[in-house]
Amino acid sequence: MNAKIRAYVALMKLRVVELLLITTVPVMMLADRGMPSLWLIAVTLVAGTLAAGSANTINCYVDRDIDQVMGRTKRRPLVRATVTPTEALTFGIVIGIVSTLMFGLLVNWPSALLADGAIAFYVFVYTLGLKRRTPSNIVIGGAAGCFPVLIGWSAVTGTVGWSAVLLFAVVFFWTPPHFWALAMKFRDDYAAAGIPMLPVVAPVEVVTRRIVGYSYAMVAASLALVPVAHTGPVYLVSAVVVGAWFLAEAHRIDRRTRRGDDPRPMRLFHMSITYLTLLFVAIAVTAVV
């Protein structure tokens, strides 16, 4: 029984969910211009975890054929037959329904609709539509990971404001550099599975140039938040400092690639997580000072 429970938890990919939820609470604080009720935060986080877990579980169900090919994913529960495909799909659908009801009945229905939209986008647009067909898969499909900022804002206000849209843009432009760095490291895995990630189908110099381009767009979106959300000097200084750090790392990986050196892409991958965390911590601080 414990093995089965662990398998269901693994299907939800909670380490990925953690990163998504890092953005939710600061956005709720910014929308509230203070600290929302702990009850609202708790319900939003639990329901958001279930929504993301639902999308991830259904993704594992759809991708079980390629997961057994990739070294990075071959120990997932469906590959090891810890749970059956039917059990996994049922679990994913059930927790998605629970998430919708929690958002709708305990938060508000706009947030429920956004959560459902995130699940549908990730499953149908990214997993079933783009992932195996185009190197733009993560560029377009990555929008699913941006929904938590919209949900966080909506949970507090019942609407989606321009500040939330800009933060959506920050995460949207952050996603390609983050995942392309990972795909550079595991290029052979993706190639063996037939997934046309950009590092699989394009020269590495093209990949690193695009990483630099998306990094500038991300930093620009983060700075545009200052006049729109009136975030003040604490956020401005933080966004400039961590943005400059990210751009320096993006240029470093591009330079090393052009020199023919090992680009060490996982360095960018890990620091991108730190960047996003620090930026949203600055948003949280701004909301309460």
Curated annotation (Swiss-Prot):
Keyword Membrane among record annotations: yes
Predominant localisation class: membrane
Origin: domain of life: Bacteria
Localization annotation: Cell membrane
UniProt GO molecular function: protoheme IX farnesyltransferase activity
EC primary class: transferase
Membrane spanning residue stretches: 9-29, 35-55, 89-109, 110-130, 138-158, 164-184, 188-208, 228-248, 269-289
Catalysed reactions listed for this entry: heme b + (2E,6E)-farnesyl diphosphate + H2O = Fe(II)-heme o + diphosphate
InterPro entries: Protohaem_IX_farnesylTrfase, UbiA_prenyltransferase, UbiA_sf
Annotated Gene Ontology cellular component terms: plasma membrane
Keywords carried by this UniProt record: Cell membrane, Heme biosynthesis, Membrane, Transferase, Transmembrane, Transmembrane helix
Membrane topology (UniProt): Multi-pass membrane protein
UniProt pathway annotation: Porphyrin-containing compound metabolism; heme O biosynthesis; heme O from protoheme: step 1/1
Function according to Swiss-Prot or TrEMBL: Converts heme B (protoheme IX) to heme O by substitution of the vinyl group on carbon 2 of heme B porphyrin ring with a hydroxyethyl farnesyl side group.
Protein family membership: Belongs to the UbiA prenyltransferase family. Protoheme IX farnesyltransferase subfamily.
Protein name: Protoheme IX farnesyltransferase
Organism (species): Frankia alni (strain DSM 45986 / CECT 9034 / ACN14a)
Lineage start: Bacteria, Bacillati, Actinomycetota, Actinomycetes, Frankiales
Gene name for this UniProt entry: ctaB
